[in-house]
């Protein structure tokens, strides 16, 4: 079992319950899911790029990604409805906690010129979204086998009702917010 999950159950719940004066432990915000999305627009010309993106996302998450398809045709981008243009993974449960632990302790500190993550990336309902410019910050990706450096979007969905609660939840996990 992931250390962060035990830490959440044993200490974070009580800490946030007293901080926000909740009457029940079920009101305490928790991380519901983590979604990883990798848009591969260049997959229109070279199908192998999408296969490599799927392999990268599989290595990072430990789960096979879903290939996302274009919802509608856009002539300006030369895409038609149904074309594969990316891949995504939704992590829940044990895999989510393990990924979250690796993200905080290993991957985020390896970001080049890292000065902290913006606290303004909350959506108004306590969910946090961040972009990673290069997938090579994850230790599962072998630098020598990378065909192209590509980024990905990471969305942390919580049960928090407000940004303040969501930020407090991530802050107790030592999420590296910019001061």
UniProtKB/Swiss-Prot annotation:
PROSITE patterns in alphabetical order: RIBOSOMAL_L5 (PS00358)
Family the UniProt entry places it in: Belongs to the universal ribosomal protein uL5 family.
Pfam families per the UniProt record, alphabetical: Ribosomal_L5 (PF00281), Ribosomal_L5_C (PF00673)
Gene Ontology terms, MF aspect: rRNA binding; structural constituent of ribosome; tRNA binding
Biological processes annotated in GO: translation
Source organism of this protein record: Haemophilus ducreyi (strain 35000HP / ATCC 700724)
InterPro entries documented for this protein: Ribosomal_uL5 (IPR002132), Ribosomal_uL5_bac-type (IPR020930), Ribosomal_uL5_C (IPR031309), Ribosomal_uL5_CS (IPR020929), Ribosomal_uL5_dom_sf (IPR022803), Ribosomal_uL5_N (IPR031310)
Role description: This is one of the proteins that bind and probably mediate the attachment of the 5S RNA into the large ribosomal subunit, where it forms part of the central protuberance. In the 70S ribosome it contacts protein S13 of the 30S subunit (bridge B1b), connecting the 2 subunits; this bridge is implicated in subunit movement. Contacts the P site tRNA; the 5S rRNA and some of its associated proteins might help stabilize positioning of ribosome-bound tRNAs.
Gene that this sequence comes from: rplE
Protein name: Large ribosomal subunit protein uL5
């Amino acid at each position: 079992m992931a250390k962060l999950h035990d830490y959440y159950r044993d200490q974070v719940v009580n800490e946030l319950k007293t901080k926000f004066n909740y009457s029940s432990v079920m009101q305490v915000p928790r991380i519901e899911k983590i979604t990883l999305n990798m848009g591969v627009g260049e997959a229109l010309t070279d199908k192998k790029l999408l296969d490599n993106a799927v392999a990268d996302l599989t290595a990072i998450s430990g789960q096979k990604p879903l290939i996302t398809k274009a919802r509608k045709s856009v002539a300006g981008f030369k895409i038609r409805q149904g074309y594969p243009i990316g891949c995504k993974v939704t992590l829940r449960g044990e895999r989510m906690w393990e990924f979250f632990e690796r993200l905080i302790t290993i991957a985020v500190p390896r970001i080049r010129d890292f000065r902290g993550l913006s606290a303004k990336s909350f959506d108004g309902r306590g969910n946090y979204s961040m972009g990673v410019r290069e997938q090579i910050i994850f230790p599962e990706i072998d630098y020598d086998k990378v065909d192209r450096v590509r980024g990905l979007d990471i969305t942390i969905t919580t049960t928090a009702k407000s940004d303040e609660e969501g930020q407090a939840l991530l802050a107790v996990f030592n999420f590296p917010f910019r001061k």
